[in-house]
């Protein structure tokens, strides 16, 4: 890649527009992912609720945005980066859930609301973080084993 192929946003307004576009793409996919947790049955409903609670708590979403932008800079279609963007946010959220636990920082609040262990209990929060770590691997596999990749 040469420097001529990639242009940085000319100004903050352009950067902000791209950032908002990427966040919108990500948030839509994240909603789908959180909804799909429920498809796994009622047996683990508390676990999925806790994972969704933490994933949907907001934040800047800089990691998924960077995944989209890295894909674009390398000449890819940003839609192909959606699984990676979801996975990286799951890993980040998993780390926040575990960091807030009483055995670590024991934080009561995260992103302006009760931390996962305060809202759902310590045991459920621990397992929700673990589940997000496992689900991140699943979404990376989606990225690696698409039908297009299999054809190469």
Regions found by a protein language model. Give the residues of each.
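Conserved N-terminal diphosphate/IPP-binding helix and adjacent helical/loop segment
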Residues: 1-84, 97, 104-105, 110-111
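Long, hydrophobic/aromatic-enriched structural stretches that serve as scaffold segments
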Residues: 90, 96-98
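Histidine- and acidic-residue-rich, metal-dependent catalytic cores
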Residues: 131-144
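Conserved small/polar residues in nucleotide/adenosyl-binding loops
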Residues: 145-152
């Amino acid at each position: 890649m040469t420097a001529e192929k990639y242009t940085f946003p000319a100004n903050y307004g352009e950067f902000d527009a791209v950032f908002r576009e990427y966040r919108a793409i990500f948030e839509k996919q994240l909603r789908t992912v959180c909804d799909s947790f429920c498809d796994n049955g009622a047996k683990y409903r508390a676990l999925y609720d806790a994972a969704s609670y933490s994933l949907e708590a907001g934040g800047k979403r800089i990691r998924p945005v960077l995944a989209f932008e890295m894909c674009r800079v390398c000449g890819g279609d940003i839609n192909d980066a959606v699984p990676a963007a979801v996975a990286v946010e799951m890993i980040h959220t998993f780390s926040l859930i575990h960091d807030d636990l009483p055995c670590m920082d024991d934080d009561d609040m995260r992103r302006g609301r009760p931390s996962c262990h305060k809202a759902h209990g310590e045991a459920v929060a621990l397992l929700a973080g673990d589940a997000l770590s496992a689900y991140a691997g699943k979404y990376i596999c989606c990225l690696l084993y698409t039908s297009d990749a299999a054809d190469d």
